[in-house]
Amino acid sequence: MSTAKLVKTKSSDLIYTRNDVAEDEKKATIEVLNRLVTELIDLSLITKQAHWNMRGANFIGVHEMLDGFRTAITDHQDTIAERVVQLGGVALGTAQVVNDRTPLKSYPLNIHSVQDHLKALADRYGVVANDMRKAIGEVEDEDTADIFTAASRDLDKFLWFIESNIE
């Protein structure tokens, strides 16, 4: 059994780490990271909602495409949440936090056509892709900016694929 303790630093609510990123930079970065964790969790759930409930032309292609998107989104959300902890923060990923903090409009539960889902998804992917790109310039920590850049590339590609399927 481990006897290790989580020790908070004296001047902050951060958990002690030997990571030498400046404390004020850590705090600001953690705030941005947690904002994006919230967005990615919500986007992954929205993606699955569409994946399960769409019907119509090109169903199987879009259905399978969305599965791949969700897997990648979940991978990025995990990397971003783990970066929060690496910097001494607490990753905020509960349903309650997501519900309280998401900037995404509530996903319509009364749509069924592939086209209606694609339009609703495009709106939400656009919000997250644009915020991810904005976040790259908001942080001073280069490792975090690199994580955001990788996620941004995927989100832009996913948005392009979604928009390319809208008739």
Curated annotation (Swiss-Prot):
It catalyses: 2 Fe(2+) + H2O2 + 2 H(+) = 2 Fe(3+) + 2 H2O. GO terms for molecular function: DNA binding; ferric iron binding; oxidoreductase activity, acting on metal ions. InterPro entries: DPS_DNA-bd, DPS_DNA-bd_CS, Dps_gammaproteobac, Ferritin-like, Ferritin-like_SF, Ferritin_DPS_dom. GO terms for biological process: chromosome condensation; intracellular iron ion homeostasis. It is found in: Cytoplasm. Gene3D superfamilies: 1.20.1260.10. Fe cation binds at H51, D78, E82. One of its GO terms (cellular component) is cytoplasm. SUPFAM superfamilies: Ferritin-like. Coiled coil: none annotated. Belongs to the Dps family. During stationary phase, binds the chromosome non-specifically, forming a highly ordered and stable dps-DNA co-crystal within which chromosomal DNA is condensed and protected from diverse damages. It protects DNA from oxidative damage by sequestering intracellular Fe(2+) ion and storing it in the form of Fe(3+) oxyhydroxide mineral, which can be released after reduction. One hydrogen peroxide oxidizes two Fe(2+) ions, which prevents hydroxyl radical production by the Fenton reaction. Homododecamer. The 12 subunits form a hollow sphere into which the mineral iron core of up to 500 Fe(3+) can be deposited. This is DNA protection during starvation protein. It comes from Erwinia tasmaniensis (strain DSM 17950 / CFBP 7177 / CIP 109463 / NCPPB 4357 / Et1/99). The lineage of its organism: Bacteria, Pseudomonadati, Pseudomonadota, Gammaproteobacteria, Enterobacterales. The gene is dps.
